[in-house]
């Protein structure tokens, strides 16, 4: 039974503690738009998206107004475009025409982003996969709202090192083609291992082939709420700490469940999942790093950080699972550097390095996220970073990802400003030693022994 105290508590979460629904994401299947004629494919894609998602933004705004809960983003995820364009696209430029169509459709319906300019190449690359991947730099340079992702490995298949090597080059090329905007294109490009089919968060969202024709997935955000709750239990035992996080996560997720069901009902689209992720913003008091400091660390990155993050992640899941009928996506704590003021402060004070962030990715939601690195970082070094993250995901049976921005013309000690939810970031140093002889081997890294479950 809900009592009046809980109602006022939820109001306080929204008013003072930065509780919001980070995104309502509509997943749309575009496989029925495939065909041999490129102009026809583009027309079908545009028509399907603008028909199914025409009321997405207005519905989100109505729900936000009625329930008093801010809904920050309305987004679309689509079937990986390497599949949709495989018959019609013969060159990377052909795929870029689809990117422009998607961008136009996204502008027409008014969403913040559209994700799914993607390829799933966990074991091998088809010709169309490779064409799409090679088109990514142009696509991101010539569009505004497109997000791109490439899945290069999984626990079941191992790591496709040919794709990893290629993605290092693609990240560099994307940085170069968007250098007039501080290499912003790379902020909309993520390389994943074990990518989920139902992720509502960008840039890794795509509508997997296992999904319904259309679906509503919701991502909730509440680092500020968790931090405020923990302020009242300073110095208490781990048991009290864990219970507090769990109860808070339950309340946050309940808000997401309410919004998801309402959006599903009004749009006439089935409800998919709630993503339990704690997603920070650059706003002060809306930071995962500040939660870790409230738990007892002087700064994020201090000894004990990985343990504190593991505990936070686990309790968020335990609390959230009870509050929703379906949980999915990434569901954990995000640790993006540029989007989290506490992380930025930790980097500036020398407490947090890329190596420590990599350790933290073993126990949190995704991976090395929104990290600005020197523009002269070699492509093979970026591939090495991607391979390391993919290995963590593959062996630990979890989603991992890399979204690094090699900012052209900038080096360690400088800062890059992305604006909005993407925030700003200090350029972080990268290990200078070479890994090209490793990265340039062809083939794939086999799946781990514990992946054989049959």
UniProtKB/Swiss-Prot annotation:
InterPro entries: UPF0210
Coiled-coil intervals, chain numbering: none
Entry-linked Pfam families: DUF711
Domain of life: Bacteria
Annotated family: Belongs to the UPF0210 family.
Quaternary data: Homodimer.
Listed NCBIfam families: PRK05313.1
Protein name per its UniProtKB record: UPF0210 protein EUBELI_01067
């Amino acid at each position: 039974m809900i009592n009046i105290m809980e109602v006022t508590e939820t109001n306080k979460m929204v008013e003072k503690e930065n509780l919001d629904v980070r995104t309502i994401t509509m997943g749309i299947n575009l496989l029925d738009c495939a065909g041999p004629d490129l102009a026809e494919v583009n027309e079908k894609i545009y028509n399907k998206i603008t028909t199914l998602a025409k009321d997405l933004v207005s519905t989100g705004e109505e729900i936000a107004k009625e329930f008093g809960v801010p809904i920050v983003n309305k987004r679309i995820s689509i079937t990986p475009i390497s599949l949709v364009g495989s018959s019609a696209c013969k060159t990377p430029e052909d795929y870029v025409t689809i990117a422009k169509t998607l961008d136009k459709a996204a502008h027409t319906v008014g969403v913040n982003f559209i994700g799914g300019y993607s390829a799933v190449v966990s074991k091998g690359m088809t010709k169309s996969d490779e064409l799409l991947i090679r088109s990514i730099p142009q696509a991101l340079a010539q569009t505004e709202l497109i997000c791109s992702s490439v899945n290069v490995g999984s626990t079941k298949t191992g790591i496709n090192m040919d794709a990893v090597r290629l993605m290092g080059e693609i990240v560099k090329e994307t940085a170069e083609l968007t250098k007039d905007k501080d290499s912003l294109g790379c902020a909309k490009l993520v390389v994943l291992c074990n990518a989920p089919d139902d992720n509502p968060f960008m840039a890794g969202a795509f509508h997997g082939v296992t999904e319904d024709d259309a679906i509503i997935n919701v991502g909730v955000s509440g680092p500020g709420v968790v931090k405020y709750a923990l302020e009242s239990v300073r110095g208490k035992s781990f048991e009290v700490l864990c219970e507090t996080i769990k109860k808070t996560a339950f309340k946050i997720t309940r808000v997401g469940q309410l919004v998801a069901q309402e959006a599903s009902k009004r749009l006439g689209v089935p409800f998919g999942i709630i993503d339990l992720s704690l997603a920070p913003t650059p706003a002060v008091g809306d930071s995962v790093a500040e939660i870790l400091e409230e738990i007892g660390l002087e700064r994020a990155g201090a000894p004990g950080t990985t343990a504190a993050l593991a505990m936070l992640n686990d309790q968020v899941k335990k609390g959230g699972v009870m509050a929703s009928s379906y949980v999915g996506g990434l569901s954990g704590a995000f640790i993006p550097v540029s989007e989290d003021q506490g992380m930025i402060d930790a980097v500036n004070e020398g407490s947090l390095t890329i190596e420590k962030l990599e350790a933290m990715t073993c126990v949190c939601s995704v991976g090395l996220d929104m990290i600005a690195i020197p523009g002269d970082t070699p492509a093979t070094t970026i591939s090495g970073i991607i391979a390391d993250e993919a290995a963590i995901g593959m062996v630990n049976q979890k989603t991992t990802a890399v979204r690094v921005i090699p900012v052209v013309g900038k080096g360690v000690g400088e800062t890059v400003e992305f604006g909005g939810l993407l925030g700003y970031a200090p350029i972080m140093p990268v290990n200078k030693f070479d890994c090209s002889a490793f990265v340039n081997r062809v083939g794939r890294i086999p799946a781990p022994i514990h992946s054989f479950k049959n």
